[in-house]
C-alpha cells in the first residue's frame, strides 16, 4: 500500500491552499507503508533423530513490515529514510532479538551526482552485492557463514553508495564500535563493487567484523546478532565458549539473464579467528538456475558446496546441498511455493544441518515446505 502523509491525514488540499497563500514552494515528500507476510507447513526428515512436521514462518521469505520515505530537497537531492521490522507470523513475536526495527533503520541524503549517504542499522555489502545469488537459490550456505542471508546487520554504520557510472557502482561502509575503551572493540566495515551490462551483472564484496561478540561492548557494530544459534560457526570447535575475535568475508557473484532463464553463480571465502587462537577457513561455491515456464510459474534449481578446514584440530568438514522449488504466482502480490532442500555432510563433518532447523543425527537431512507469500 502506497500513500503519503498528507493524503493519510486528508490535508493535501488544505496544505496546498496555505502554500499558495503564503506564495512559498514546498518540497514534495512521500511515505510508503509496505510489508510481506509468509508462512506454511514443512516436513523435516531428521531433527535429532526424529522426523518432524512443523508450522513455519517465512517459508517463501522472511515476514516484515516497514516505512520508507523521501523528501525532495531540490537540485537532484532528497532526504531518505527506512524503518523495517521483522516478525514471526506463527506466534506474532518480533524478529532480530525483539528490536522495534531490527531489519533496517536508517536516514540519509541521496544525490543524483554524488550518490547516497545513510546512517543507522543497515545491511552490509555482502548482502547488497552477492546476497541476491543466495536468495535466488532458495537455500542458505551452512550456518549462513558468509552472511549471504543477512543474519548479521551493521549498526552504528555510515554507508555511501555511489551513482552508477559506465555500468560500475560501488559502496563503502563503516560501523563504529561506540566504545570508549577500544576503537576495534566490535567495529566493522565492508566494501562492494559491481558492474552491469545488458543482461549480465557481476559483483565483488568484502566485509570484516572485529570482536563481533564483545562481552564488554554489547552496543557495537554487530552486537547480539552474533549470538544467534543460526550462526553455527560463531564459536570455536575447540572451546565452544570462545567466540570469534574476527570474521572476514570475501565474496563474488552475479547473474546472466538468458531469455526466460536466470543463471547465477557465487564464490565466497570466509575466515574465522577465535578468541582461543584457533582458526576456521570456509569456502562456498553456488550455482543457481531459475526458469520462467510461464509468466506465473517459476522453477528453480541450485547446488551449493562448502569446504572447510580447522587448523588446531586438523579436520576438513564438507557439505553438499541441493535446493529445488516450484513457485506459482496467483497475482502480482501473492504466490505459493513448494520447496525441497537436501544436505549431505562429507569429509570430517559429523552431521547435516539445513539453515533454520535443528541438526540431523546423521550426515543427511531433507526438508520439504509448502508455503505462501503476500506483499503489500
Model regions: which residues?
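Outer-envelope beta-barrel architecture signal
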Residues: 29-35, 71, 75-79, 113-117, ...
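Outer membrane beta-barrel
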Residues: 28-42, 53-177, 185-209
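Transmembrane beta-strands of outer-membrane beta-barrel pores
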Residues: 39-45, 85-89, 123-125, 174-178, ...
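Hydrophobic, lipid-facing positions within transmembrane beta-strands of outer-membrane proteins
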Residues: 61-65, 103-107, 154-158, 189-191, ...
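Sec/Tat signal peptide C-region and signal peptidase I cleavage site
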Residues: 20-27
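Detector for outer-membrane/organellar transmembrane beta-barrel domains
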Residues: 192-323
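Outer-membrane beta-barrel "beta-signal"
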Residues: 328-330, 362-376
